[in-house]
C-alpha cells in the first residue's frame, strides 16, 4: 500500500521504476520482504497467519496507490499495473462495508482485479472454474416478448451464491463504463437492518423475486433430460422450444457476472454480518430460497447496448414507485438517449474532471460540497456549445464526413464517442492555454479565497468565449490559446455576476482575440 497526502503527480512518477521492478518478479519481492530485517514484524505475521496455510506462490500481490487528491489519466497511463484507490473509492467502500460488513469483500476483490479462484479455500480446489447448478425454467422470447436473443430464466438460488457473483451499478461506486452513467443508489443501512430483523424473526424468505441480468458466456443451460442446450453468440438456442421449459442452470463461480437490477436490499440483507441476527441469517444464507428472475442477454451485445437495456428495465420497474426521484429518471433517460445534449455534456464534465486543468475540480460525489457544481455548466455552458446545429457549435467545427449520422434515430456509439472525444479535446485545449496564463494561487475555486477565479461563472464564460471563436473561425491548439491569453492578466473576473456568462465570454473574446 502506497499513500501520499501531497501532490501525487511527481510522487507517483518517482515510484514508476520501483513499481515496475516489483511487478516484473512478485515472488522475488515477497522473498525480499520476508528476508529483510526491516520487515521482521511482517515476517512474523506472514508465518503465523499465511505461510502455514499457503505457499508463497499462492500469494497474490497488488500495488495499491492511495491519494486524497485525484490522479489524472495522463499520469495513470504512464504508471500502469497499479490499483488506484481514489478517495472517492475509499469513501464508497467505507459506506458499503459498514452496511454489509464482510460481504463487501467480494466487490473489493473485484476492484483489486484478484482472481476469485485463487482466494482462500478456492486455491485448494482441483477444478479451474468451479460452477454451481440451479433448478429453474427457461422462458423464450416468444413468451416474454423481449427482442431476439434475450431469454428469461427463473431459478431458486441461495443468497451466499448470489452475493459472491453479484454486482450493482451504483452511481457513487468505482465501476466506470466511460460513456454510460450509473444510476442505482447506495445501500440504505436502515432498510438493511429492518430486513435482517424480519429474516431473524420470521425465518422465511421475502416473497418478491430478484431481477438480474446474466451473460450467456458465464452460464450453461441443460434441458429436463440434462442435455446441454447450445447457445450461440447471438443468444439463440439451437434446440429451442417456443414454450417455457424446465432447465438446469449452471453458473460459473466468478464475481461480477450477475447484475442486480431490482432487489439489492433484499439480496444484501443476507450479508455476512456481526449483529445479533447473524446466527439466524447464517443458516438462511446457504438455503436455496431466493427466487431469481434473470434476463439472459446474448454474448455479442455491446457494453453500451447492454447497459441501455438494463437501465430501461430498471426504469420500467421503478418509475411508478414513490422512491424514484426525478434525478434518477433523468440519469436513465440520458442512458437511453445518449445522443442528447445533456448526456453528451455530462460525459464532457466527467472527462474534464479526470485530467487537464480542471482535474478534480467538479463535484461528483455526495461529500464534495466544496467543489464546483455542474448543473449550470451543463445547461448554460456546454449544451449550447455541443448542439448539433448552429454556427457557434463544436459540431460545426468537427471535421467528420459521417457526422450527420448522429442526427438519425439509430444509435451509432462509435461515431458518438468520436464526437465526445473531439469536444473534450477542444475544450481542454482552450483551458490549457488559458490556465497557463493564470497563477497557481488564482487557479483555485473562488469560494476558498478572494483571489481565486474558478467558478461556474468563469467556466461558462470561457465556454461562451469558445463559441465566439468558432463563429469567427479563430480556434486553434493549446499553444495558440496560450499566446492569445497572455492579455488576460488584467481581466476583472469578479465584475461579472453569476448569470452573465455570455457577457463574460464576449469580453474575454474581445480582450484576447481581437487585434
Give, region by region, the residue ranges found by the protein language model:
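Short acidic loop-to-beta-strand element that houses the catalytic metal-binding Asp/Glu
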Residues: 1
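Accessory terminal alpha-helical modules
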Residues: 6-515
Amino acid at each position: 500500500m502506497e499513500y501520499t497526502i501531497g501532490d501525487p503527480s511527481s510522487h507517483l512518477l518517482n515510484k514508476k521504476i520501483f513499481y515496475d521492478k516489483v511487478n516484473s518478479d512478485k515472488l522475488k519481492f515477497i522473498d525480499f520482504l520476508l528476508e529483510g530485517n526491516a520487515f521482521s514484524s511482517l515476517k512474523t505475521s506472514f508465518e503465523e497467519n499465511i505461510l502455514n496455510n499457503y505457499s508463497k506462490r499462492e500469494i497474490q500481490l497488488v500495488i495499491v496507490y492511495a491519494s486524497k487528491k485525484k490522479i489524472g489519466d495522463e499520469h495513470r497511463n504512464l504508471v500502469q499495473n497499479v490499483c488506484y484507490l481514489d478517495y472517492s473509492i475509499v469513501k464508497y467502500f467505507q459506506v458499503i462495508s459498514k452496511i454489509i460488513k464482510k460481504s463487501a469483500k467480494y466487490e473489493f476483490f473485484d476492484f483489486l482485479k484478484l482472481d476469485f479462484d485463487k482466494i482462500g479455500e478456492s486455491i485448494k480446489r482441483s477444478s479451474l472454474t468451479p460452477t454451481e447448478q440451479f433448478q429453474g425454467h427457461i422462458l423464450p422470447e416468444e413468451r416474454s416478448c423481449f427482442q431476439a436473443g434475450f431469454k428469461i430464466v427463473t431459478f431458486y438460488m441461495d443468497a451466499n451464491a448470489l452475493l459472491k457473483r453479484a454486482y450493482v451499478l451504483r452511481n457513487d461506486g468505482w465501476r466506470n463504463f466511460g460513456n454510460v452513467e450509473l444510476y442505482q443508489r447506495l445501500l440504505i443501512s436502515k432498510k438493511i437492518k429492518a430486513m435482517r430483523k424480519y429474516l431473524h424473526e420470521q425465518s422465511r424468505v421475502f416473497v418478491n423475486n430478484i431481477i438480474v441480468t446474466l451473460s450467456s458466456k458465464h452460464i450453461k443451460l441443460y434441458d429436463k433430460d440434462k442435455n446441454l442446450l447450445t447457445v450461440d453468440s447471438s443468444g439463440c438456442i439451437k434446440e429451442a422450444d417456443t414454450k417455457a421449459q424446465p432447465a438446469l442452470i449452471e453458473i460459473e463461480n466468478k464475481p461480477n457476472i450477475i447484475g442486480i437490477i431490482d432487489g439489492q436490499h433484499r439480496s444484501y440483507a443476507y450479508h455476512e454480518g456481526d449483529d445479533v441476527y447473524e446466527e439466524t441469517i447464517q443458516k438462511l444464507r446457504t438455503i436455496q430460497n431466493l427466487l431469481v428472475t434473470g434476463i439472459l442477454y446474448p454474448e455479442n451485445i455491446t457494453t453500451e447496448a447492454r447497459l441501455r437495456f438494463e437501465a430501461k428495465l430498471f426504469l420500467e420497474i421503478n418509475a411508478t414507485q414513490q422512491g424514484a426521484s426525478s434525478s434518477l429518471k433523468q440519469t436513465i433517460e440520458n442512458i437511453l438517449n445518449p445522443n442528447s445534449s445533456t448526456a453528451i455534456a455530462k460525459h464532457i464534465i466527467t472527462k474534464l474532471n479526470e485530467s487537464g486543468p480542471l482535474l478534480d475540480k467538479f463535484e461528483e460525489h455526495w461529500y464534495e460540497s466544496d467543489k464546483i457544481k455542474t448543473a449550470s455548466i451543463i445547461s448554460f455552458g456546454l449544451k449550447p456549445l455541443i448542439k448539433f446545429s448552429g454556427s457557434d457549435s463544436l459540431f460545426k467545427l468537427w471535421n467528420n464526413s459521417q457526422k450527420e449520422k448522429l442526427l438519425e434515430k439509430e444509435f451509432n456509439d462509435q461515431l458518438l464517442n468520436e464526437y465526445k472525444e473531439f469536444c473534450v479535446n477542444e475544450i481542454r485545449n482552450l483551458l490549457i492555454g488559458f490556465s497557463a496564463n493564470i497563477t497557481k494561487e488564482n487557479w483555485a475555486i473562488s469560494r476558498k479565497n478572494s483571489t481565486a477565479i474558478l467558478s461556474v461563472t468563469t467556466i461558462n464564460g470561457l465556454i461562451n468565449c469558445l463559441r465566439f471563436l468558432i463563429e469567427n473561425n479563430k480556434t486553434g491548439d493549446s499553444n495558440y490559446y496560450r499566446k492569445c491569453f497572455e492579455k488576460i492578466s488584467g481581466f476583472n473576473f469578479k465584475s461579472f455576476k453569476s448569470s452573465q456568462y455570455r457577457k463574460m465570454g464576449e469580453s474575454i473574446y474581445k480582450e484576447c482575440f481581437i487585434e
